[in-house]
Amino acid sequence: MSTRQAVFERDVDEDRWPRSARGLAGVNTVFEGDSEINSKAMRLLEKTRHRRNLLNRREDRRRYLGGVKAKAIESDYYHRNQLPSSYDAGNDDFEPINNSHVESEEENKRLPEKYSLDKYVKRSRKQRDHRHIVAKPKEKRNFAPSKLAMYEIEKYQRSTALLIQKIPFAKLVKEVTEEFAGESQDLRWQSMAILALQEASEAYLVGLLEHTNLLALHAKRITIMKKDMQLARRIRGQFI
């Protein structure tokens, strides 16, 4: 009888062992004269039991406590795959190796929290209720003509962009040049030249309308009239 022969027979009835534990059926076998094999078998058995306990605790933690730091999960994985360096077969107070000092780059990251059934139901109900709600049309605010005019004046005074569209202004410039130059001369305009003309034209019109508005206010009116513009041009030295 060799030293690797088991003390008790291994022909154990397979019905006594569940399907998941049949692979470990021979782990409890003790061999005579070979302490190394016995220690390895006991380590494997303890590792399997410890892995099962850790897995249950980890699942419960993720299910009921929500997000868990990645460091704790990494520590659990480390315990599950770590064999103890020294194990005393007669010591029942076995504690796993503490690897809380293991640092990870993702220790500050948190796992996504698992949805509970109540939150999911409440969220789906809110989405369903919002579908049937008809959006109320925005009420139009009615401004007095004087207030609306002053609002538009202040709006355009704050802005610095060009008020006339570029393409219609360019067409007008080309029509005027063709009228004065004649059809014999084919004149072409650069975009920068047309832009400079537009800025100068808008500056002149804005200044003229500003003076016209001041004259209308001086006459205790809001609406500008033709005579206001004529007076403004005469004061500025531009005779009609």
From Swiss-Prot:
GO cellular component, one term: kinetochore
Disordered: annotated segments: 83-109
Region (H3-like), start-end ranges: 127-238
Primary location recorded for the protein, binned into one broad class: nucleus
Membrane-spanning residues: none
One MF annotation (Gene Ontology) recorded for this entry: protein heterodimerization activity
Location within or outside the cell: Nucleus; Chromosome, Centromere
GO biological process: 2-micrometer plasmid partitioning; kinetochore assembly; mitotic sister chromatid segregation; protein localization to CENP-A containing chromatin
PTMs per UniProt: Ubiquitinated. Is degraded through ubiquitin-mediated proteolysis when not protected by its association to the kinetochore.
UniProt-listed SMART domains: H3
Family annotation (InterPro entries): Histone-fold, Histone_H2A/H2B/H3, Histone_H3/CENP-A
The organism's place on the tree of life at top rank: Eukaryota
Residue stretches in coiled coil: none
UniProt keyword list: Centromere, Chromosome, DNA-binding, Nucleosome core, Nucleus, Ubl conjugation
Function: Histone H3-like nucleosomal protein that is specifically found in centromeric nucleosomes. Replaces conventional H3 in the nucleosome core of centromeric chromatin that serves as an assembly site for the inner kinetochore. Required for recruitment and assembly of kinetochore proteins, mitotic progression and chromosome segregation. May serve as an epigenetic mark that propagates centromere identity through replication and cell division.
Family: Belongs to the histone H3 family.
Subunit composition and interactions: Component of centromeric nucleosomes, where DNA is wrapped around a histone octamer core. The octamer contains two molecules each of H2A, H2B, CSE4/CENPA and H4 assembled in one CSE4-H4 heterotetramer and two H2A-H2B heterodimers. Interacts with the inner kinetochore.
Protein name: Histone H3-like centromeric protein CSE4
Protein species of origin: Candida glabrata (strain ATCC 2001 / BCRC 20586 / JCM 3761 / NBRC 0622 / NRRL Y-65 / CBS 138) (Yeast)
Organism taxonomic ancestry: Eukaryota, Fungi, Dikarya, Ascomycota, Saccharomycotina
Protein's gene: CSE4
